[in-house]
């Protein structure tokens, strides 16, 4: 910055900017520093398995449940006993918790940066829209609601609204 500054008796009375150069455009960002603890519900950037169990249906093309026709499966199905706790794959904000047609009882969590996870066919839900959840927090219980042929957790990972193969994100 080049400026013409006028002083009267040692006190600045006028300043006129003659020219300025921006060396680098400012970037809006959140910086974590100091000793303040990070909220537990903030996403960690990695996902965990929502339940332990055997994968009974993979991502992509498959025969429709009931054996008639075919569908493009938007997630994976993980078998589990009725009532088994379902856990959040990462921290975030619950954006849906309720009945959603073929999904049955569904929980949807927004993890930020374009990532959303869905957990379907639950027997019961333990979170509500607007809740902040942490990675590993119980959010539902395994069931067979909606278009389902047995107890399992349907797990989806979506990036910018597009379903992705969850196995590419799980350890």
Features from the language model and the residues they span:
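Well-ordered beta-sheet/strand-loop patches within structured domains
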Residues: 1-60, 81-82
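Catalytic cores of peptidoglycan-degrading enzymes
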Residues: 41-171
């Amino acid at each position: 910055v080049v400026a013409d500054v006028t002083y009267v008796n040692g006190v600045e009375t006028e300043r006129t900017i003659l020219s300025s150069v921006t060396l680098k455009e400012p970037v809006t960002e959140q910086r974590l520093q100091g000793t303040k603890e990070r909220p537990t519900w903030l996403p960690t950037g990695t996902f965990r398995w929502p339940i332990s169990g055997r994968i009974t249906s993979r991502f992509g093309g498959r025969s429709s449940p009931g054996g008639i026709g075919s569908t493009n499966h938007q997630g994976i199905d993980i078998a589990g006993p009725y009532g088994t706790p379902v856990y959040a794959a990462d921290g975030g904000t619950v954006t849906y918790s309720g009945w959603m047609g073929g999904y049955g009882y569904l929980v949807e969590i927004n993890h930020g940066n374009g990532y959303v996870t869905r957990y379907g066919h639950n027997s019961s839900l333990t979170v509500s829209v607007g809740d902040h959840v942490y990675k590993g927090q119980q959010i539902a219980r395994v069931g067979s609601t909606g278009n389902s042929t047995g107890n399992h957790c349907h797990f989806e990972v979506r990036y910018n609204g597009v379903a992705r193969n969850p196995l590419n994100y799980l350890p």
